[in-house]
Each structure stands twice: as structure tokens, then as C-alpha cells.
């Protein structure tokens, strides 16, 4: 038991230090296109464009349904994962993006093999088959105190901050555009 706890702590320490620290440039330009007055919605609807594979979060596993057959995968088993949130399928249907609270965001194959640990990246969404958008956010227990919208290439480990505001949350991709919220504003940027 003690060895398992020590190994878990070592893994957590390594995860906090090593993954996806490579700052880089994924896009050559980030251009602000539009700013509208808006409040942050309390609910967000998932984009279910992919029909051939469906994924849903259920307790401590992820369900993958393909061609009518459902399998359960547990890519980050307990004690590392208490639950899976923000589960989504890549546009090409080959990878699953998910978050484990207090552990970070991961990418795995549809068979459950983890291929990338992205670290701190909340509300992650696919921009394309390689790039993931998310929030690197901090709060005081009730409100965001700082938050950046970040793009991460899960294959190369490149990371780029896309927002210029102190608080930027809940990115939503609509290629080549990305929409996100800043206090009382909906901001649209164009990526090149």
C-alpha cells in the first residue's frame, strides 16, 4: 500500500513538472475578429458531429460505442482517476480526449492506450485532429482569478497562449475561428 502511494505521488510530481512545458508557436497569427457583450453561459452543448463512434462518461470508465458494439475502457485507472469529465472524440474518430480532476487532461486511443498527458488544461476541446484548445485557469474557490485560452499540439507538445485577456474561458472552435468568453464579452479570434 505504501509503495503504491509513493509511486502515485512520484507520478503526480512528474506529471506536474514534465508534460507539455514546451512553449512554442502553433499558429503564425492570432487575430481578434469580433468582441460582443455577453454573459458566460452556465451550460455548454457538446458538438456531436462524429456519428460512427459515440463516447460517454460513466463513473470510473469511458464507454466507446462503435458499429453497435459498446466497450468500456479505463485508460487512467484508480487510484489515479476518480472520474472522467470533458470526454470527447477526435474529428477523425481515432482518439479520445478526457480530463481527470486533479490529474490533468489526457489523450488515448479508442482502445484506451494513453498517448499524451497534457497536464493542466481544463474544458478541453478538439480544434482539429492534432490541436486541442483548453483553459489554463486559476480560481479563489468561487471566481476565476486568471485564465488563458491555450492551444496544445498533443503530438509535438507545442503549447501556445491564444488569449490576451486576464480572464479567458470556455473556448469553442469553429475552424479557423475560436470563440471564448472574457468577463461580459464573447471574443472571436482567427487562427492562421
Protein language model regions, located:
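Blade-terminus and WD-like Trp-Asp/Gly-His loop motifs, strongest in beta-propeller folds
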Residues: 43-49, 56, 87-95, 124-133, ...
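Beta-strand-rich domains and repeat architectures in extracellular enzymes and scaffolds
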Residues: 33-60, 81-85
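Bacterial N-terminal signal peptides
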Residues: 8-19
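A short beta-strand motif characteristic of beta-propeller blades
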Residues: 30-34, 69-78, 113-118, 158-163
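Short coil/turn segments at the loop-to-beta-strand junctions that recur within blades
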Residues: 35-40, 77-83, 118-125, 164-170
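Short loop/turn segments that connect beta-strands within beta-propeller blades
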Residues: 65-68, 109-113, 153-157, 192
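Short, solvent-exposed loop/turn segments at conserved positions within beta-propeller repeat blades
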Residues: 55-58, 99-102, 141-147
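Acidic, small-residue rich beta-repeat scaffolds with periodic aromatic anchors
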Residues: 26-34, 140-192
Amino acid at each position: 500500500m505504501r509503495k503504491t502511494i509513493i509511486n502515485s505521488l512520484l507520478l503526480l510530481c512528474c506529471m506536474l513538472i514534465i508534460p507539455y512545458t514546451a512553449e512554442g508557436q502553433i499558429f503564425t497569427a492570432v487575430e481578434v475578429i469580433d468582441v460582443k457583450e455577453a454573459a458566460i453561459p452556465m451550460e455548454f452543448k457538446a458538438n456531436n458531429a462524429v456519428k460512427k463512434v459515440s463516447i460517454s462518461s460513466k463513473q470510473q470508465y469511458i464507454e466507446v460505442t462503435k458499429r453497435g458494439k459498446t466497450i468500456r475502457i479505463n485508460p487512467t485507472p484508480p487510484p489515479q482517476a476518480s472520474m472522467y469529465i470533458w470526454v470527447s472524440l477526435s474529428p477523425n474518430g481515432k482518439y479520445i480526449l478526457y480530463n481527470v480532476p486533479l490529474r490533468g487532461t489526457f489523450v488515448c486511443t479508442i482502445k484506451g492506450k494513453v498517448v499524451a498527458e497534457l497536464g493542466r488544461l481544463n474544458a478541453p476541446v478538439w480544434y482539429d485532429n492534432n490541436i486541442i484548445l483548453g483553459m489554463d485557469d486559476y480560481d479563489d474557490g468561487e471566481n476565476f482569478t486568471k485564465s488563458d485560452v491555450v492551444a496544445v499540439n498533443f503530438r509535438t507538445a507545442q503549447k501556445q497562449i491564444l488569449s490576451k485577456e486576464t480572464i479567458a474561458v470556455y473556448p469553442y472552435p469553429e475552424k479557423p475561428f475560436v470563440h471564448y468568453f472574457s468577463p461580459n464579452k464573447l471574443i472571436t479570434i482567427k487562427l492562421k
